[in-house]
Amino acid sequence: MTASSPSIRVTDLSYSVAGRELLSKLKFHLQSGEMLAVLGRNGAGKSTLLKHLTGELGKSGVELFGQPLRDIKPAEAAKRRAVLPQQTPLSFAYEVLDVVLLGRIPHGQRETVQDRAIAAACLERVGLSGYETRDVLTLSGGEQQRVHFARTLAQLHGVIGERVLLLDEPTASLDLAHQHATLRLARELCREGVGVLAVLHDLNLAAQYADRVLMLAEGHVIACDHPAVALTPESIRTAYGHEVLVTQHPCLNCPLIVSAS
């Protein structure tokens, strides 16, 4: 793989269930150090796409770090590709630090003092320093989501070479301040060379934080470009069936989307 090759490349990815096409000939890529936001209404194919990128629904049409996904052993992929699902329910009263330490499993069979230090540092990055011995089941939904975000940070920590982080609606259960804190941290990871793909519902968060947006409608790509190019009233109408006004944010160098009705 060359330095300019994508961390993820999707080529002619299609997927159907019971004769219904959920994804149709998708084609896009994710570069190292880039944040790509995946947008679209419910049922557009966002979660189905994410399950293909993880190999859950099949591995054809997807390359990871320049290799076909089907040729990469799961244990090797786990060292360099981390996934934050929208929901990660836990049934047992794990301590918070132990949950974060799950992210270190791909890197060795035995837990080390260094692993615990890494996990604690990752908790600090998500604003949960001091929560190490808390029962994860006593935390709010948003706090639990941040614990799992710390787990993905621990999973990618110290890895040499390309890394990818897949986020499925990472801001869904968070308040306003933590939505922005989470996406600012995602941007920090991009500056560290991580390729970040995030499924988002909030168009303005995507406009503010993403380098590019991939907009889906009924399993088709209708736009894949910089937010200022892709987020137009026409593309948003096609994707969401709703009229919007798109203007320039008064403080930030990005589009601002407001409802027209």
From Swiss-Prot:
<dbReference type="GO" id="GO:0005524">
    <property type="term" value="F:ATP binding"/>
</dbReference>
<keyword id="KW-0614">Plasmid</keyword>
<dbReference type="InterPro" id="IPR003593">
    <property type="entry name" value="AAA+_ATPase"/>
</dbReference>
<dbReference type="GO" id="GO:0005886">
    <property type="term" value="C:plasma membrane"/>
</dbReference>
<comment type="subunit">
    <text>The complex is composed of two ATP-binding proteins (HmuV), two transmembrane proteins (HmuU) and a solute-binding protein (HmuT).</text>
</comment>
<comment type="function">
    <text>Part of the ABC transporter complex HmuTUV involved in hemin import. Responsible for energy coupling to the transport system.</text>
</comment>
<feature type="domain" description="ABC transporter">
    <location>
        <begin position="8"/>
        <end position="243"/>
    </location>
</feature>
<dbReference type="GO" id="GO:0016887">
    <property type="term" value="F:ATP hydrolysis activity"/>
</dbReference>
<dbReference type="InterPro" id="IPR027417">
    <property type="entry name" value="P-loop_NTPase"/>
</dbReference>
<keyword id="KW-0067">ATP-binding</keyword>
<keyword id="KW-0547">Nucleotide-binding</keyword>
<feature type="binding site">
    <location>
        <begin position="40"/>
        <end position="47"/>
    </location>
    <ligand>
        <name>ATP</name>
    </ligand>
</feature>
<protein>
    <recommendedName>
        <fullName>Hemin import ATP-binding protein HmuV</fullName>
        <ecNumber>7.6.2.-</ecNumber>
    </recommendedName>
</protein>
<keyword id="KW-1278">Translocase</keyword>
<keyword id="KW-1003">Cell membrane</keyword>
<dbReference type="Pfam" id="PF00005">
    <property type="entry name" value="ABC_tran"/>
</dbReference>
<keyword id="KW-0472">Membrane</keyword>
<comment type="similarity">
    <text>Belongs to the ABC transporter superfamily. Heme (hemin) importer (TC 3.A.1.14.5) family.</text>
</comment>
<dbReference type="InterPro" id="IPR003439">
    <property type="entry name" value="ABC_transporter-like_ATP-bd"/>
</dbReference>
<keyword id="KW-0813">Transport</keyword>
